[in-house]
Amino acid sequence: MLHLHKSGISHAELTAGVENMLEMVGIPASRKSEYPHQFSGGMKQRLVIAIALACEPKLLLADEPTTALDVTIQAQVLDMMNELKEKLDTAMILITHDLGVVAQTCDKVAIMYAGEIIESGTAEDIFNSSFRHPYTDGLFGSIPDLTKNIRRLSPIDGLMPDPTDLPAGCRFHDRCPKCMERCRTVPPPAVKIGGHLIRCHLAEQNAEGGNV
């Protein structure tokens, strides 16, 4: 990566750069010549992050950076990413299905369904709002709540639509427990609710009625 983006770099500079990035992600520089099979899953994830940050990018795209990691290692990796983001003054777009990761890491949130942003705002607005998109509500409903005695979670019914044959109207309507007739034919507009935007006819209706 350094060879590719920094032409003319000397061997000594390359070695120093590799050692610096390893130390930055918590891996001893002495392990720079080891092979992938000699590292744990968490360390491999740290190495990938080190490679991504080696050339000091202004924007880091992190697609499911904690997949297949246990909870303890996941927390360590997220803390490290937050620290490096501040230290290197790098913006980060995190792609994840895990709302716990979102709560720990993100300032702003955009929730997508079938290739479309259906809700966006600050993390605080999304997590604390009294009104959310039905799909967002479904995501929150599928998270275990340790304060309640619930034997089964509440998964979202149905399946994702075929991206080559998206439904008319709201793309979520055939899975939505609050679906209205116009949801089946009319694409919903983005409506501002508090500090965030929701693409939902129900949000539009409630906003017009002054209920939210």
Give names to the regions the model predicted:
Residues Y35-F39, M43:
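Conserved ABC ATPase signature
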Residues S33-Y35, R151:
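Interfacial catalytic loop of ABC nucleotide-binding domains
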